[in-house]
Each structure stands twice: as structure tokens, then as C-alpha cells.
């Protein structure tokens, strides 16, 4: 709710449509088609994936010795971009997507071998929730081809990751930003 309130405070009109990201996408597509809105896709678009890939390039430029990258995993744009860029430079690098243990759409889709719908749930890592779109055109295949594994975290593990980042490094993060540290602290990587 804090994110929605912040968006409204900036003057935007917020419309909550349906019960899932997939429901909202149907409405967004209608608005583009019927009312001339401009859509900026959150993850499943080549330009978005390419932009996210610059993170992988910067990581390897700064630390060419990195053997493994942990990537927050949601709709797959970030994971696809970082993994593809990093693998282009360093083909043997290990790429691990990290998500919450409930409502992890990309993880469930990878396990099923195709995009699937999942129930969206409240989470400390809520920005990792939401569907990937049943007609996913880019991020699913790139994640399938470039992630070595996915790791799922409980709410307690995410909370402990957030706390560790705050108390040890003085970083205030949302849950999704803490999943890499949380996976390490939980011994899942």
C-alpha cells in the first residue's frame, strides 16, 4: 500500500484492476488498444531486458572474478538481462534466480516448462510477486536458457536478510532487494 500511496502522492491516477498482475495486464492492453495509452512493459520486452543486462556488464567489469550471481526473480526481465549479459562475457558463470516461496511465477513456470498462472500473495518481497504472462514472449525463454537454478525463500528468511542488511550494513531495503543476502544467510546457495 505504501507504494500505491507514493504513486498517488506524485499525482498519478492509480487503478487497481482484478486480482493479479495478469488481470491488470489484460486491462493495460485494452487501454493501449482502445484509448491510445502507451505501455511501458515491466519485464517482458527486449529493451527492458537489454537495459537490465547492463547490471551484469557492470558487475563483471567491477569484479571479473565473480563465479556466481544471485538475481531477484520476478517476471524475469532483470534475471534474463543480467544472466544473458553476464553469460555473454563469462559463459561459465553460475546464475541463480531468487524468489519467495509463495507465488513465485517464474520459478513455477520454469518447473512446468511453460508460463503458468500462480496465486499472488502478500509478502515482504511483494515486488517479486505477480505473473509472467501466459503469452510471455521473451523473459521466460531467456530465464530457462540462462539460469542454472532458482532458490525459494520463506518470509522468515527474507526478514532475516533485511535485518542483516540493516544491522550490519545500515541498508534499509524492501524484501525483494534482500533476497540475495537472505539466500546466503539461509545457506541455500
Residue ranges and their predicted role:
Residues 1-189:
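PLP-dependent amino-acid enzyme catalytic core
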Amino acid at each position: 500500500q505504501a507504494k500505491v500511496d507514493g504513486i498517488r502522492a506524485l499525482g498519478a491516477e492509480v487503478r487497481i484492476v482484478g486480482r493479479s498482475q495478469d488481470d491488470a495486464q489484460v486491462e493495460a492492453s485494452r487501454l493501449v488498444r482502445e484509448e491510445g495509452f502507451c505501455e511501458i512493459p515491466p519485464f517482458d520486452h527486449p529493451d527492458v531486458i537489454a537495459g537490465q543486462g547492463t547490471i551484469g556488464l557492470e558487475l563483471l567489469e567491477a569484479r571479473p572474478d565473480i563465479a556466481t550471481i544471485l538475481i531477484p526473480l520476478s517476471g524475469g526481465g532483470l534475471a534474463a538481462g543480467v544472466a544473458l549479459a553476464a553469460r555473454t562475457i563469462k559463459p561459465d558463470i553460475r546464475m541463480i534466480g531468487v524468489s519467495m516461496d509463495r507465488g513465485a511465477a517464474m520459478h513455477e513456470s520454469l518447473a512446468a516448462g511453460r508460463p503458468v498462472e500462480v496465486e499472488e500473495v502478500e509478502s515482504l518481497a511483494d515486488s517479486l510477486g505477480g505473473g509472467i504472462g501466459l503469452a510471455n514472449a521473451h523473459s521466460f525463454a531467456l530465464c530457462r536458457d540462462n539460469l542454472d537454478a532458482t532458490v525459494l525463500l520463506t518470509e522468515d528468511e527474507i526478514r532475516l536478510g533485511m535485518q542483516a542488511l540493516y544491522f550490519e550494513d545500515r541498508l534499509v531495503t524492501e524484501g525483494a532487494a534482500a533476497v540475495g543476502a537472505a539466500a546466503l544467510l539461509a545457506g541455500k546457495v
